[in-house]
Amino acid sequence: MANSSSFSPSTTVTDLISTVHDDIIESHILTRLDGATLASVSCASSHLHHLASNEILWSKICRSTWPSCSGGSRSFFSDAYSMVETAGTVSDLDRPFPELISAVDLHYRGKLIFSRVVKTETTTAWFKSSPLRIDLVDTKDTVATPIKRRQRTEDTCRDLEKDLTLSWIVIDPIGKRAANISSHRPVSVQRNWISGEVEAQFATVVGAVECVITVVTCGEEEMHVREVSLKVEKMEGTHLNGRDSLVILRSVMEGKRVNGSRREVESKKRHEEFMEKKREMKEKKMRVESVFDILTVAFGILGFVLLVVFCLWRTSI
């Protein structure tokens, strides 16, 4: 009777990989993978996990994915690549948070056209009480781009919606956490009919608020970036101040994460749901105000009628 033996597929794969020299795997295989694939490979075996944990690999991936970040690591990639599913609870509100770092990269058709790192002081009274607005482009400056403006505004908007991508990573240097609050591609692109500029909005919804990034482009032939800004907006339409915005951003950094591969689809879906709720809330508010106005007019007329009746009664005595 012939001897038979069974092999576990995972064991067979591991044995085959172990026959390949580590230098070949590190230099010719792992260096060709993107961050998401490298993370998946590291889960295949303990040997690959050890090789894929090389800090140099993750630093190169972070620099190529986010040029605004001069260095990086595996944990940073995990924070910045993943998408927030639900916001976390900020338990230590009294922990020092002296500055918020924003690392921003704007691409058009895969080509980097804007990259900047900005530090925002968070301890001043002005920051805490004023509506949060982080501007990356000076009001007097513009950034030249290779984007050509089409003859029809609709075509220009369609091009930007398809080819413009943005990463806005907020970093807590004390807590050593980060999160990408951009939707990667615009959730909306439209022309400002007053100024004629084209505005692209990227957004991440966090509960009843939305982190809105606005990119404003101008120019008749070759377009320039005139504004790249961040605000945190409530469903009622008002903007949160710096103190409350900081709590929201920290809850995003500490929230539950999911794979960021569906960031564009999920972000746009959440944005549309947010805007629908916003419209419903606005309509409800208008209905309440309309009823209040009707009651005010009715009571006014009733008061006037009673006053006339009272005056007539007095004159008849």
Swiss-Prot record:
F-box domain location: 25-74
Database matches in Pfam families: F-box-like (PF12937)
Top-rank taxon, per record: Eukaryota
InterPro entries in the record: AT3G44326-like (IPR045283), F-box-like_dom_sf (IPR036047), F-box_dom (IPR001810)
Protein name: Probable F-box protein At2g36090
